[in-house]
UniProtKB/Swiss-Prot annotation:
Residues binding substrate, per UniProt: K31, R45, Y57, Y141
Enzyme class: hydrolase
Protein name as annotated: Inorganic pyrophosphatase
Cofactor(s), names only, from the UniProt record: Mg(2+)
Entry's Gene Ontology cellular component terms: cytoplasm
GO BP annotations listed: phosphate-containing compound metabolic process
GO MF annotations, alphabetized: inorganic diphosphate phosphatase activity; magnesium ion binding
Gene: ppa
Stored InterPro entries: Pyrophosphatase, Pyrophosphatase_sf
Binding site for Mg(2+) 2: D72
UniProt keyword terms in alphabetical order: Cytoplasm, Hydrolase, Magnesium, Metal-binding
Residues noted as binding Mg(2+) 1 in the record, renumbered to the chain: D67, D72, D104
Subcellular location: Cytoplasm
Length: 176
C-alpha cells in the first residue's frame, strides 16, 4: 500500500507547486489525521467548539516541520474535497502559528487546476476578511479543550516557499 507521506513526492515543482494531501475537508468539525506509520486516515477527535475548518486542510508529503509533524497546508477551494484527495497547489502565504508553544506554521495555497485562482499568487490577492476568518478559527478552536494556540500573523508566498524548502530538508535529514 502506498504511504501518502513517505512515498509521494512533495510536488511536481516544489516549492512553487506542491502536493497537498487532504486530511480534513472544508466545513468539517471532524479532525481526521493521516497515520503516517500505518497509512490510513483516522478520526482524531471532533472539535470541542462550534468552529469548523474554513478550508481544506492537510499536509505536504515528504516534509517534516519544527513541531515534528509533516508541514501543514490549507487549500482555498470552491467546494470541499475528501480525506486522501491529493491536490496540486501553489503556495501563496504562510500563517505563523504556535500550538502549545510549538511552532506550527501553515502554508496557504490555491489549486493549480482551478481557473478561478490562476491570478492568485500572493496574500495580496486574497480578501483580508478570509485571512482574518482563518486566523480567528486557528486562534480559538482548541480553547474548550484547555489548549492554547496563537496566530502570530501572515507572511507572503516567499515565506511559504522557504518553509517548504526547510521542511523538505528536515524530512531528508530525518528519513533520508
Amino acid at each position: 500500500m502506498m504511504n501518502l507521506w513517505k512515498d509521494l513526492e512533495p510536488g511536481p515543482n516544489p516549492p512553487d507547486v506542491v502536493y497537498a494531501v487532504i486530511e480534513i475537508p472544508r466545513g468539517s468539525r471532524n479532525k481526521y489525521e493521516y497515520d503516517e506509520e500505518r497509512g490510513f486516515f483516522k478520526l482524531d477527535r471532533v472539535l470541542y467548539s462550534p468552529f469548523h475548518y474554513p478550508l481544506d486542510y492537510g499536509f505536504i508529503p515528504r516534509t517534516l516541520y519544527d513541531d515534528g509533524d509533516p508541514l501543514d497546508i490549507l487549500v482555498i477551494m470552491q467546494d470541499p474535497t475528501f480525506p486522501g484527495c491529493v491536490i496540486e497547489a501553489r503556495p501563496i502565504g504562510l500563517m505563523k502559528m504556535l500550538d502549545d508553544s510549538d511552532q506550527d506554521d501553515k502554508v496557504l495555497a490555491v489549486p493549480t487546476e482551478d481557473p478561478r485562482f490562476k491570478d492568485v499568487k500572493d496574500l495580496d490577492d486574497v480578501p483580508k476578511h478570509l485571512l482574518d476568518e482563518i486566523a480567528h478559527m486557528f486562534s480559538e478552536y482548541k480553547r474548550l479543550e484547555g489548549k492554547e494556540t496563537e496566530v502570530l500573523g501572515w507572511e507572503g508566498a516567499d515565506a511559504a516557499k522557504e518553509a517548504i524548502v526547510h521542511a523538505i530538508e528536515l524530512y531528508e535529514e530525518e528519513h533520508g
